[in-house]
A protein has these predicted regions:
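Active-site metal-binding core of divalent-cation-utilizing nuclease and nuclease-like domains
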Residues: 6, 71, 135-184, 190-194, ...
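A generic fold-level signal
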Residues: 15, 79-80, 119, 162-164, ...
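Soluble or luminal CAZymes and related metallo-dependent hydrolases
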Residues: 52, 116-120, 197-200
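Nuclease-adjacent, charged terminal/linker segments that flank catalytic cores
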Residues: 1-108
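Amphipathic alpha-helical dimerization/coiled-coil segments
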Residues: 93-143, 181
Length: 201
């Protein structure tokens, strides 16, 4: 994407639109409800937030920077609230161009198992970020998704191994006795992965 096209697209995107694109880059797949909970929190009611998020996502879809998967949560009758969103190649190129990066990704319709697992991971991630926003004395200092949260370590024989959790989270809990900071690697298990794959992670 050349600079002129990127600039023209940027002129049509609000700060919240940009944040939605960055969320989709970070989390890979998000439902309309996830994005509503993350970015449409300043509305008078949940219904108003739902309508605003649906309008914004349809506008971003019309601009060609996001796409709804063919698969929906809860079936077609649930309407736009059931949509699962991802960046398009255009959306990814726009973000990459805005940072001056050359790397490219391919965007394909993911399989059902990947979608289910990714949405489960993101349910937890969004819940933690909501708790950070609403719960007094609790904060999320860092939340890393794959592959940014992967860690390299040495095995028993000195060989290089990798830890590949779904999420890495650092939280802080304040309390009368000073509170504490907790570091956690989180793995979401839906009972669909074989044991050797889990052990390999």
């Amino acid at each position: 994407m050349n600079r002129q096209v990127a600039t023209r697209l940027a002129e049509q995107l609000s700060d919240r639109d940009q944040a939605v694109l960055l969320d989709l880059e970070r989390f890979r797949l998000l439902s309309t409800k996830h994005l509503q909970r993350l970015r449409f929190t300043d509305h008078a009611s949940e219904l108003a937030a739902a309508r605003a998020s649906a309008r914004a996502l349809r506008r971003l879809e019309a601009l060609g920077v996001v796409a709804a998967l063919d698969r929906r949560i809860g079936g077609v009758r649930k309407g736009s609230a059931s949509c699962i969103w991802q960046l398009t190649a255009t959306g990814e190129r726009y973000l990459r161009a805005s940072r001056g990066e050359a790397r490219r990704r391919r965007f394909l319709e993911p399989g059902a198992a990947f979608v289910n697992h990714t949405l489960a991971v993101n349910d937890l991630a969004v819940g933690l970020l909501e708790a950070d926003r609403h719960q007094s004395g609790f904060s999320v200092e860092q939340l890393q998704t794959e592959p940014h949260n992967w860690r390299r370590y040495l095995g028993p024989s000195g060989e290089v191994k990798w830890l590949k959790p779904d999420l890495h989270v650092i939280t802080v809990v304040d309390s009368d006795d000073g509170g504490y900071e907790e570091h956690a690697f989180l793995e979401i298990d839906l009972g669909t992965e074989h044991l050797p794959r889990i052990q390999a992670k």
